[in-house]
Curated annotation (Swiss-Prot):
It catalyses: a quinone + NADH + H(+) = a quinol + NAD(+); a quinone + NADPH + H(+) = a quinol + NADP(+). It comes from Archaeoglobus fulgidus (strain ATCC 49558 / DSM 4304 / JCM 9628 / NBRC 100126 / VC-16). NCBIfam families: flav_wrbA (TIGR01755), PRK03767.1 (NF002999). This is NAD(P)H dehydrogenase (quinone). Homodimer and homotetramer; in equilibrium. GO terms for molecular function: electron transfer activity; FMN binding; NADH:ubiquinone reductase (non-electrogenic) activity; NADPH dehydrogenase (quinone) activity. Binds 1 FMN per monomer. Belongs to the WrbA family. It comes from the Archaea. Keywords: Flavoprotein, FMN, NAD, Nucleotide-binding, Oxidoreductase. Its cofactor is FMN. PANTHER family: FLAVODOXIN-RELATED PROTEIN WRBA-RELATED, FLAVOPROTEIN-LIKE PROTEIN YCP4-RELATED. Residues 4-184 form the Flavodoxin-like domain.
Amino acid sequence: MARILVIFHSITGNTMKLAKAVADGAREGGAEVAVKRVPETIPAEILEKNPGYVKVREELESFEVARPEELQDYDAIIFGSPTRFGVMSSQMKQFIDMTGRLWMERRLEGKVGAVFTSNEMPHGGKEATLLSMLLPLFAHGMIIVGLPPAKELYRAGSYYGAASTGVPKEDDLQVAKMLGKRVAEVAEKLC
Protein backbone atom coordinates (compact mmCIF):
# COMPACT_ATOMS: atom_id res chain seq x y z
CA MET A 1 0.00 0.00 0.00
CA ALA A 2 1.43 3.36 -1.07
CA ARG A 3 1.89 6.04 1.59
CA ILE A 4 0.84 9.50 0.40
CA LEU A 5 1.25 12.92 1.99
CA VAL A 6 -1.13 15.67 0.93
CA ILE A 7 0.46 18.90 2.10
CA PHE A 8 -1.21 22.27 1.68
CA HIS A 9 -1.33 25.94 2.59
CA SER A 10 -4.67 27.70 2.92
CA ILE A 11 -5.98 30.88 4.49
CA THR A 12 -9.66 30.98 3.50
CA GLY A 13 -10.17 27.22 3.36
CA ASN A 14 -10.48 26.81 -0.42
CA THR A 15 -7.17 24.99 -0.86
CA MET A 16 -7.93 22.98 2.28
CA LYS A 17 -11.18 21.76 0.68
CA LEU A 18 -9.27 20.66 -2.39
CA ALA A 19 -6.69 18.93 -0.15
CA LYS A 20 -9.44 16.92 1.53
CA ALA A 21 -10.85 15.89 -1.86
CA VAL A 22 -7.37 14.92 -3.12
CA ALA A 23 -6.91 12.81 0.03
CA ASP A 24 -10.32 11.15 -0.47
CA GLY A 25 -9.34 10.23 -4.02
CA ALA A 26 -5.99 8.82 -2.88
CA ARG A 27 -7.76 6.69 -0.26
CA GLU A 28 -10.19 5.54 -2.95
CA GLY A 29 -7.11 4.51 -4.94
CA GLY A 30 -6.01 2.28 -2.05
CA ALA A 31 -3.37 4.48 -0.43
CA GLU A 32 -2.63 5.25 3.20
CA VAL A 33 -2.97 9.04 3.35
CA ALA A 34 -1.80 11.78 5.71
CA VAL A 35 -2.98 15.38 5.27
CA LYS A 36 -0.83 18.12 6.77
CA ARG A 37 -0.34 21.85 6.38
CA VAL A 38 2.75 24.00 6.02
CA PRO A 39 3.56 26.50 8.78
CA GLU A 40 1.70 29.80 8.61
CA THR A 41 3.99 32.83 8.51
CA ILE A 42 1.43 35.64 8.57
CA PRO A 43 1.15 37.13 12.08
CA ALA A 44 -2.03 36.13 13.93
CA GLU A 45 -3.15 39.75 14.39
CA ILE A 46 -3.23 40.16 10.59
CA LEU A 47 -4.92 36.81 9.93
CA GLU A 48 -7.66 37.65 12.44
CA LYS A 49 -8.70 40.58 10.21
CA ASN A 50 -9.48 38.19 7.34
CA PRO A 51 -13.11 36.99 7.71
CA GLY A 52 -12.43 34.00 5.46
CA TYR A 53 -9.66 32.84 7.78
CA VAL A 54 -11.70 33.40 10.94
CA LYS A 55 -14.44 31.09 9.55
CA VAL A 56 -12.07 28.16 8.96
CA ARG A 57 -9.35 28.77 11.56
CA GLU A 58 -10.28 25.87 13.84
CA GLU A 59 -10.48 23.40 10.98
CA LEU A 60 -7.18 24.60 9.51
CA GLU A 61 -5.47 24.32 12.88
CA SER A 62 -6.75 20.76 13.28
CA PHE A 63 -4.24 19.65 10.65
CA GLU A 64 -0.76 18.81 11.89
CA VAL A 65 2.06 21.06 10.66
CA ALA A 66 4.42 19.16 8.36
CA ARG A 67 8.20 19.07 8.72
CA PRO A 68 10.36 19.06 5.57
CA GLU A 69 12.40 16.03 6.68
CA GLU A 70 9.30 13.82 6.87
CA LEU A 71 8.67 14.08 3.12
CA GLN A 72 11.15 11.26 2.58
CA ASP A 73 8.87 8.90 4.54
CA TYR A 74 6.19 8.88 1.83
CA ASP A 75 5.92 7.23 -1.58
CA ALA A 76 4.07 10.21 -3.04
CA ILE A 77 3.62 13.86 -2.08
CA ILE A 78 0.83 16.07 -3.39
CA PHE A 79 1.37 19.79 -2.78
CA GLY A 80 -1.47 22.34 -2.66
CA SER A 81 -1.19 26.11 -2.48
CA PRO A 82 -3.36 29.13 -3.14
CA THR A 83 -2.34 31.24 -6.10
CA ARG A 84 -0.60 34.45 -5.09
CA PHE A 85 0.20 36.79 -7.98
CA GLY A 86 0.50 33.82 -10.35
CA VAL A 87 2.75 31.67 -8.16
CA MET A 88 2.50 29.49 -5.06
CA SER A 89 2.12 31.17 -1.67
CA SER A 90 5.26 32.31 0.12
CA GLN A 91 4.44 29.87 2.91
CA MET A 92 4.54 26.90 0.52
CA LYS A 93 7.66 28.26 -1.20
CA GLN A 94 9.41 28.65 2.15
CA PHE A 95 8.52 25.08 3.08
CA ILE A 96 9.82 23.74 -0.23
CA ASP A 97 12.96 25.85 0.14
CA MET A 98 13.62 24.05 3.42
CA THR A 99 13.95 20.73 1.55
CA GLY A 100 17.51 21.52 0.43
CA ARG A 101 19.04 18.76 2.54
CA LEU A 102 16.63 16.24 1.04
CA TRP A 103 17.67 17.47 -2.41
CA MET A 104 21.38 17.18 -1.61
CA GLU A 105 20.88 13.62 -0.36
CA ARG A 106 18.46 12.74 -3.22
CA ARG A 107 15.83 11.57 -0.71
CA LEU A 108 12.82 12.46 -2.88
CA GLU A 109 14.21 11.05 -6.12
CA GLY A 110 11.79 8.57 -7.68
CA LYS A 111 8.87 9.54 -5.46
CA VAL A 112 5.60 10.51 -7.10
CA GLY A 113 4.63 14.19 -7.03
CA ALA A 114 1.58 16.22 -8.01
CA VAL A 115 0.12 19.67 -7.34
CA PHE A 116 -3.15 21.57 -6.94
CA THR A 117 -4.17 25.20 -6.41
CA SER A 118 -7.04 27.61 -5.86
CA ASN A 119 -7.44 31.31 -6.54
CA GLU A 120 -10.09 34.01 -6.39
CA MET A 121 -10.21 35.18 -10.01
CA PRO A 122 -10.95 33.22 -13.21
CA HIS A 123 -7.74 34.49 -14.80
CA GLY A 124 -5.63 34.76 -11.66
CA GLY A 125 -2.76 32.55 -12.82
CA LYS A 126 -3.76 29.04 -11.74
CA GLU A 127 -1.81 27.26 -14.49
CA ALA A 128 1.24 29.43 -13.84
CA THR A 129 0.99 28.50 -10.16
CA LEU A 130 0.72 24.80 -10.93
CA LEU A 131 3.77 25.01 -13.19
CA SER A 132 5.75 26.97 -10.58
CA MET A 133 4.95 24.29 -8.02
CA LEU A 134 6.11 21.52 -10.36
CA LEU A 135 9.60 22.98 -10.90
CA PRO A 136 10.99 22.04 -7.45
CA LEU A 137 9.51 18.55 -7.84
CA PHE A 138 11.46 18.12 -11.08
CA ALA A 139 14.59 19.39 -9.29
CA HIS A 140 14.10 16.69 -6.65
CA GLY A 141 13.88 14.01 -9.35
CA MET A 142 10.27 13.20 -8.55
CA ILE A 143 7.98 11.41 -10.99
CA ILE A 144 5.28 13.92 -11.89
CA VAL A 145 1.66 12.88 -12.25
CA GLY A 146 -0.85 15.15 -13.93
CA LEU A 147 -4.38 14.60 -15.13
CA PRO A 148 -5.21 12.86 -18.42
CA PRO A 149 -7.77 14.37 -20.79
CA ALA A 150 -11.23 13.99 -19.25
CA LYS A 151 -14.57 15.73 -19.68
CA GLU A 152 -14.27 17.06 -16.10
CA LEU A 153 -11.21 19.08 -17.15
CA TYR A 154 -13.26 21.17 -19.56
CA ARG A 155 -14.73 23.06 -16.60
CA ALA A 156 -12.31 22.41 -13.75
CA GLY A 157 -8.65 21.69 -13.28
CA SER A 158 -5.78 21.45 -15.72
CA TYR A 159 -3.53 18.78 -17.12
CA TYR A 160 -0.93 20.05 -14.64
CA GLY A 161 -3.08 19.50 -11.53
CA ALA A 162 -6.38 20.21 -9.84
CA ALA A 163 -7.55 23.82 -9.47
CA SER A 164 -10.52 25.90 -8.42
CA THR A 165 -11.65 29.50 -8.59
CA GLY A 166 -13.11 30.64 -5.28
CA VAL A 167 -14.88 28.08 -3.13
CA PRO A 168 -14.40 24.72 -4.90
CA LYS A 169 -17.49 23.59 -6.76
CA GLU A 170 -18.50 19.95 -7.11
CA ASP A 171 -16.66 19.54 -10.42
CA ASP A 172 -13.50 21.05 -8.87
CA LEU A 173 -13.70 18.53 -6.03
CA GLN A 174 -14.25 15.68 -8.52
CA VAL A 175 -11.10 16.65 -10.42
CA ALA A 176 -9.19 16.89 -7.12
CA LYS A 177 -10.37 13.37 -6.24
CA MET A 178 -9.31 12.18 -9.70
CA LEU A 179 -5.83 13.59 -9.08
CA GLY A 180 -5.53 11.87 -5.70
CA LYS A 181 -6.72 8.55 -7.08
CA ARG A 182 -4.37 8.76 -10.06
CA VAL A 183 -1.38 9.52 -7.81
CA ALA A 184 -2.30 6.57 -5.58
CA GLU A 185 -2.53 4.22 -8.54
CA VAL A 186 0.81 5.35 -9.99
CA ALA A 187 2.54 5.24 -6.59
CA GLU A 188 1.23 1.73 -5.98
CA LYS A 189 2.67 0.54 -9.29
CA LEU A 190 6.06 1.99 -8.36
CA CYS A 191 6.18 0.64 -4.80
